Swiss-Prot record:
It is found in: Cell inner membrane. This is NADH-quinone oxidoreductase subunit A. It is an enzyme of class 7 (translocase). The keyword Zinc-finger does not apply. The keyword Transport applies. The lineage of its organism: Bacteria, Pseudomonadati, Acidobacteriota, Terriglobia, Bryobacterales. Gene3D superfamilies: NADH:ubiquinone/plastoquinone oxidoreductase, chain 3. It is a multi-pass membrane protein. Its EC number is 7.1.1.-. Its main location: membrane. NDH-1 shuttles electrons from NADH, via FMN and iron-sulfur (Fe-S) centers, to quinones in the respiratory chain. The immediate electron acceptor for the enzyme in this species is believed to be ubiquinone. Couples the redox reaction to proton translocation (for every two electrons transferred, four hydrogen ions are translocated across the cytoplasmic membrane), and thus conserves the redox energy in a proton gradient. NDH-1 is composed of 14 different subunits. Subunits NuoA, H, J, K, L, M, N constitute the membrane sector of the complex. PANTHER family: NADH-QUINONE OXIDOREDUCTASE SUBUNIT A (PTHR11058:SF22), NADH-UBIQUINONE OXIDOREDUCTASE CHAIN 3 (PTHR11058). Belongs to the complex I subunit 3 family.
Length: 135
């Protein structure tokens, strides 16, 4: 006999309540017991243990943004592979290779996009050098 949704999801709800309660409790104890000393050193921004110097308003090369966008693009495409991997056994159980060919097409499109941006030089950081076959 199947259990009700309340019985099925009660452990998850209990875990969430315990996690939030533990986090709130630890933050409260830290706030109540911690010292409240404010000085110039504590008010400085922390940057990997290095004392910050200069102004934070510098121009960044567009290549940083390009690489960031390409990373997000290919990362999301890699995330789309995960559900396919999970259900692949069910897709191929009846002997059909449709799911395999569908994902093979998807991977070929991803790789062709990757080779296209590589060929266009979107991943080159240095000054362009004279390479054979490249203008």
């Amino acid at each position: 006999m199947p259990k009700s949704y309340t019985e099925l999801y009660f452990p998850i709800l209990l875990q969430a309540v315990i996690a939030m309660g533990l986090a709130a409790g630890l933050l409260t104890v830290s706030y109540l017991l911690g010292k409240k000393v404010r000085n110039r050193v504590k008010d400085m921004p922390y940057e990997s243990g290095i004392v910050p110097t200069g102004d934070a308003r510098h121009r960044f090369s567009v290549k940083f943004y390009l690489v960031g966008m390409l990373f997000i693009l290919f990362d999301i495409e890699a995330i789309f592979l995960y559900p396919w991997v999970v259900v692949y056994r069910d897709l191929s159980r009846n002997g059909s290779l449709f799911g395999f060919y569908e994902m093979l097409t998807f991977v070929i499109l991803i790789l062709s996009g990757f080779f296209y941006i590589w060929k266009k030089g979107a991943l080159d950081w240095g000054e362009p050098t004279a390479r054979p076959g490249r203008k």
